[in-house]
Amino acid sequence: MKRQADRSGTVVAVRGGIVDARFDGEMPALHSLLLAGAQDEIVVEVMLHLDGGHVRGNALTPTQGLACGDTIKDSGAPLQAPVGQAILGRVFNVFGQPIDRREPPDGCRWRSVLTKPAGLTERSSKTEMFITGIKAIDVLAPLERGGKAGLFGGAGVGKTVLITELIHNMVGQHEGVSLFCGIGERCREGEELFREMREAGVLDNTVMVFGQMNEPPGARFRVGLTALTMAEYFRDDQGRDVLLLIDNIFRFIQAGMEISGLLGLMPSRLGYQPTMGTELAELQERISSTRHAAITSIQAVYVPADDFTDPAAVHTFSHLSASIVLSRRRASEGLYPAIDPLASTSNILNPRIVGERHYRLAQEIRRTLATYEELKDIIAMLGLEELSREDRRIVFRARRLERFLTQPFHTTQQFTGMQGRTVALDAALNGCEAILNDEFSEAPEKILYMIGGLEEARQRLREEETAGHGEEPP
């Protein structure tokens, strides 16, 4: 990355990741990068213009070794990202520097990460479904091609597992480019994901960008824009569809909160930055479909203390076309993926887009599961026998639907010992319809647990009947 450093200033204050500098001549522009250190290894982004020729910047690298009186140079350019065919199959940091122990890619161009979203006249209004191969998502909360989907959940309910399974299912069948952006997540998870994708042979059409949790908040705050700049190149310049996976949007908001506090801005509710809505919109509005191609985004969103009224979750909800909510209660019951079928929603679940049969089945499933939730208190107090015959049938259907919507994942196969399943939409709909029609009312619930399609359930039932007939009487 080439930078022209011709204007110099002096460091006057260093407070953690915040650096104040004085420029006697021309002031550096907002968002311009300042370089300090013997080898320009300390990078600071200008965030505020103060009075008297002073600027305040946010460090994108650790500031160890920086002292008052040191020289700091204006690069004359904002943060930039490499774009081009050569970035495929590589792993980068926020500066576009490779972190996969290989030489920098050749023939790349550099673009500013601070670009405007596509104009309204450039955007596509076409709506179509994006198949994931996961039953609970495709049936009850289908994703939109060129839309934004959020995976909401607290700590330990399976957000990262679900997003890695989505990568596994979609990267192989996805004809465009897949781009994974890790914001403030564990280095170990990124390394495991890189290794899995390389072994699966899908790394050649994938780009990975990381701003890890041990990096300064400035790097975590900007790494999403670096990834988006790369995604926009493939969408606009090459006309290729892009699958953008982000883990975790909450860490982006959290990094902005840290920067806001260090800059001395007045906090808003629960300590969040007053500009949270604007900052999130700047990121989310660049994820869109145009007449050239589409960027489809799936984003993990950590929900602090499982509180869905938290401002970070509330602000994120409004940008999404599908919200997939993960439930701690379902996870504790062993119903994986722990997707809450009643809380999860999708804007495209209407008969004009998904078809009359899909819409009707999804509504019937929700109605059955909602009635079961209402009956749980009565069952706990009085027992199942006190329910009417029709209510008992609803309970039996709901329990079988809950188990059928579970699914073994390829990415957890080494832990569970169960072969992963990718289920076609028709197979998922046929299974739900059969259960709603009481086809499995006499069968044990366990044959529907952790399977793909109904053929597996029928095979299990035949095996149980064979085993039962083969037993000798006592």
UniProtKB/Swiss-Prot annotation:
Swiss-Prot/TrEMBL keywords: ATP synthesis, ATP-binding, Cell inner membrane, Cell membrane, CF(1), Hydrogen ion transport, Ion transport, Membrane, Nucleotide-binding, Translocase, Transport
Primary site of residence: membrane
Annotated SUPFAM superfamilies: C-terminal domain of alpha and beta subunits of F1 ATP synthase, N-terminal domain of alpha and beta subunits of F1 ATP synthase, P-loop containing nucleoside triphosphate hydrolases
Chemical reaction(s) catalysed: ATP + H2O + 4 H(+)(in) = ADP + phosphate + 5 H(+)(out)
Gene Ontology molecular functions: ATP binding; ATP hydrolysis activity; proton-transporting ATP synthase activity, rotational mechanism; proton-transporting ATPase activity, rotational mechanism
Presence of the UniProt keyword Membrane in the record: yes
PROSITE patterns cross-referenced by the UniProt entry: ATPASE_ALPHA_BETA
Top-level taxon of the source organism: Bacteria
Enzyme Commission numbers on file: 7.1.2.2
Keyword Nucleus belongs to the record: no
Subcellular location: Cell inner membrane
GO (cellular component) term, any one: proton-transporting ATP synthase complex
Residues reported in the UniProt entry to bind ATP: G153, G154, A155, G156, V157, G158, K159, T160
TM regions (residue ranges): none
Membrane-topology annotation of the record: Peripheral membrane protein
Enzyme kind, highest EC tier: translocase
PANTHER family listed in its UniProt record: ATP SYNTHASE, ATP SYNTHASE SUBUNIT BETA, MITOCHONDRIAL
Subunit (UniProt): F-type ATPases have 2 components, CF(1) - the catalytic core - and CF(0) - the membrane proton channel. CF(1) has five subunits: alpha(3), beta(3), gamma(1), delta(1), epsilon(1). CF(0) has three main subunits: a(1), b(2) and c(9-12). The alpha and beta chains form an alternating ring which encloses part of the gamma chain. CF(1) is attached to CF(0) by a central stalk formed by the gamma and epsilon chains, while a peripheral stalk is formed by the delta and b chains.
Function: Produces ATP from ADP in the presence of a proton gradient across the membrane. The catalytic sites are hosted primarily by the beta subunits.
Family assignment from sequence similarity: Belongs to the ATPase alpha/beta chains family.
Protein's name according to its UniProt entry: ATP synthase subunit beta 2
Organism: Syntrophotalea carbinolica (strain DSM 2380 / NBRC 103641 / GraBd1)
